[in-house]
Amino acid sequence: MAGYVQHGQTTTLEHAAAVAYLSLALVRKLGIRCNERALVRGALLHDYYLYDWHDHNAAPDAWHGFTHPRHALRNAEADFPDLTPLERDIIAHHMFPLVPSPPRHVEALVVSLVDKACSTIEVFAQRPWVRTPEGGAAC
């Protein structure tokens, strides 16, 4: 995941880590009761599709925005056979409404919303999740 660019200059690994961190921070800040372990695992694996979606020769199809949750879920199931149904829901439905089936659990809804916020930040900010030498976030 570290070898693939997600949005702007952000790698897929940086993006997934940001979504996991901010999803957990959000549920704790708002006092949302949920399965935090599944929330973090699902967030870390939500874009586990393992290809460069910018390279049309590497991508399995031309509809990345619509199909990558399916590829991510397939890869996650192969590499992490202990995935729970909740973690599968997070991965499979994080692109709602592009994926027409809505999230079934609050954890999946949180990851879906935080993913969109992180993606927007990553498109418009250069390296937003990279720490500066002073120790602060770049944005």
Task: For every predicted segment, state its role.
Residues M1-C139:
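Metal-dependent phosphohydrolase cores
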